[in-house]
């Protein structure tokens, strides 16, 4: 079913890893989005089996390296969602991107210290921090227009996270319109989900 239903998965339990490894002859990791986790299915099983990166995992790494090393410009990175730890990426990303768009709940999570780090970014014109509607569950229409304008100029786009509580129809407009702009763009795109 789902390996995460078993507590031993997240504990990276060695006995659990060994028992799962006995079900196969080799291990192929296709799960780029969880490679950072120290779970049994990611780092435990490979101890007991010959292990390989799958073709999809290799392609995702190749695409990220392309963005990092030789992006076609302008490069626009949209960082959004609800995880505050994403904020620490704004400044480093501003060193490689032509524009960094900050959306989702992140503008609301930016305390004075986080805002100061954005202000200290090498070229603050590169960083566009979105505005939120009154209940803070979506970005404003002005922010949508500004983000879409930057996206339509881009030759490379990296998108990480949603812009509002998109599962609620009343708060899905920002995500829908910005994602439609990304989808219709002819730019090279790397899209990651999550919050």
Question: Which role fits each region the language model picked out?
Answer:
Residues 2-195:
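Active-site loop-to-helix "anion-binding N-cap" substructures in soluble metabolic enzymes
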């Amino acid at each position: 079913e789902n390996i995460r239903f078993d507590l031993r998965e997240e504990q990276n339990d060695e006995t659990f890893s060994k028992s799962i490894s006995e079900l196969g002859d080799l291990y192929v990791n296709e799960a780029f989005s969880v490679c950072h986790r120290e779970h049994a299915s990611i780092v435990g099983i490979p101890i007991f089996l010959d292990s390989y990166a799958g073709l999809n995992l290799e392609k995702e790494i190749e695409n990220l390296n392309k963005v990092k090393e030789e992006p076609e410009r302008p490069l626009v990175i949209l960082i959004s969602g609800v995880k505050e730890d994403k904020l620490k990426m704004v400044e480093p990303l501003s060193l490689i991107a032509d524009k960094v768009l900050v959306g989702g709940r992140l503008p609301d999570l930016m305390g004075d210290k986080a805002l100061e780090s954005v202000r200290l970014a090498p070229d603050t014109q590169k960083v566009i921090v979105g505005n939120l509607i009154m209940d803070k569950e979506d970005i404003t229409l002005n922010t949508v227009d500004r983000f879409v304008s930057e996206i339509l100029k881009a030759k490379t786009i990296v998108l990480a996270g949603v812009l509002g509580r998109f599962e609620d129809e009343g708060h899905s407009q920002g995500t829908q319109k910005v994602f439609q702009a990304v989808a219709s763009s002819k730019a090279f795109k790397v899209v990651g989900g999550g919050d």
